[in-house]
Amino acid sequence: MKFSVLTLFPQLVWPYFEDSILKRALEKNLFELEVLNLRDFSANKYQKADHTLIGGGAGQILDPEMVENALHSVKNPKHTIFLSAVGKPFKQTDAMRLAQKKHVVLVCGRYEGFDERSIELGADEVFCIGDFILTGGELGALCLIDSIARHIQGVLGNAQSLENESFENHYLEAPNFANAVFKSKEINKIPAPLEYSKGNHAKIKQLKLDLSKLRTKFYRLDLFKQHKS
């Protein structure tokens, strides 16, 4: 699988892949990463990347011809995602679905975002990562890549670790407790559930499901109501 990131600030993207799981996955060629500087596709000799808004208003928007040129430079087949606050919220089911694609292109917004024609002409999907505003789409793109890459075979050392994670079964992950002895009196005042250490895997599984539902009801009542059974 390949990810292509189109951004005005490539230097914000690469450092995320210099450590840990995703670095190892790249080194093993489990996925490819391409980062393109949008300014390189500006028709302006000074590589101007933005324009004022028709009708007035504060801020600038990205040059739609620059975005178009950049997208044309990326080979097909590709699935193009624009990162924008106006997009639909990205969910775990989206990560699982997109992990089946061969090539995902992520276009990072800046300033006041995109000319609407860029979205109409270039986007297969538009996503946001929450109901808040960031200075650019790079963090959103990194979130999507991280979430999608976890579902690529071989990226995680233990594929089973995906099964019990939050949102995999529509509920938040059950509480976890370290298998260790601690000196801290405060930590020891809060014992882990005894059932966790008894070795009865069927009972542990049921307890974790029950705790998962309780945690979801407490932290994310919206999710709990959607999937209550």
Curated annotation (Swiss-Prot):
EC assignment: the record states 2.1.1.228
Catalytic activity as recorded in UniProt = guanosine(37) in tRNA + S-adenosyl-L-methionine = N(1)-methylguanosine(37) in tRNA + S-adenosyl-L-homocysteine + H(+)
The superkingdom listed in its UniProt entry is Bacteria
- Which UniProt keywords are listed? Cytoplasm, Methyltransferase, S-adenosyl-L-methionine, Transferase, tRNA processing
For biological process, the GO terms are: tRNA N1-guanine methylation
One term under GO cellular component: cytosol
Gene Ontology MF term list: tRNA (guanine(37)-N1)-methyltransferase activity
- Where in the cell? Cytoplasm
Whether Methyltransferase counts among this entry's keywords is yes
- Parts of the chain that traverse the membrane: none
Enzyme class, spelled out: transferase
Q: Which residues bind S-adenosyl-L-methionine?
A: 109, 129-134
* Subunit and partners: Homodimer.
Name the PANTHER family on file. Answer: TRNA (GUANINE-N(1)-)-METHYLTRANSFERASE
Protein family membership: Belongs to the RNA methyltransferase TrmD family.
What's this protein's function? Specifically methylates guanosine-37 in various tRNAs.
- Stored NCBIfam families: PRK00026.1, trmD
What is the protein's given name?
A: tRNA (guanine-N(1)-)-methyltransferase
